């Protein structure tokens, strides 16, 4: 019974994060950001890696300052590194942690590009490309692959895709 109550509480946190994401996607960036900050204070720096990764990933998107966006994306990556498939499967059975990395590294590459740090951007776009094989051939996977390709071209990495 205690385990079921704990699972319900964890699911409640993911629901609350999802509600803040919906606010942001609906155009209310400031309200979403405020809710994310409140949730982050509940979760804490050492809280559940799934909660930290998910929240930080979406909180980064609400940032206007690229330095702040980078800080949140780095938090998301750090939390993903702590996340296990076992924990993730408690929330969503068909997802593996390795499937997070293409998007996480793509976001970091974009952050570094905005900050005019091309070597760091290239490093992360290469890591995104290396991890992209973990994604399904579906709308999400296709979108991430396309975004990686666009950023590779912007960073001058597009030639790495040509096979002779």
Task: Tell where the protein language model's regions lie, with residue ranges.
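Alpha-helical segment of the N-proximal tetratricopeptide repeat
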Residues: 14-34, 41
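Structural signature of alpha-solenoid helical repeat junctions
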Residues: 11, 28-31, 47-51, 68, ...
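Conserved small/polar residues in nucleotide/adenosyl-binding loops
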Residues: 162-164
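TPR repeat positional signature
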Residues: 16, 52-56, 105, 124
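Alpha-helical adaptor scaffolds
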Residues: 54-98
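TPR/TPR-like (Sel1-like) alpha-helical repeat modules
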Residues: 70-82, 114-136
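Flexible helix-coil transition and linker loops at the boundaries of alpha-helical arrays
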Residues: 3-6, 42-47, 81-97, 135-138
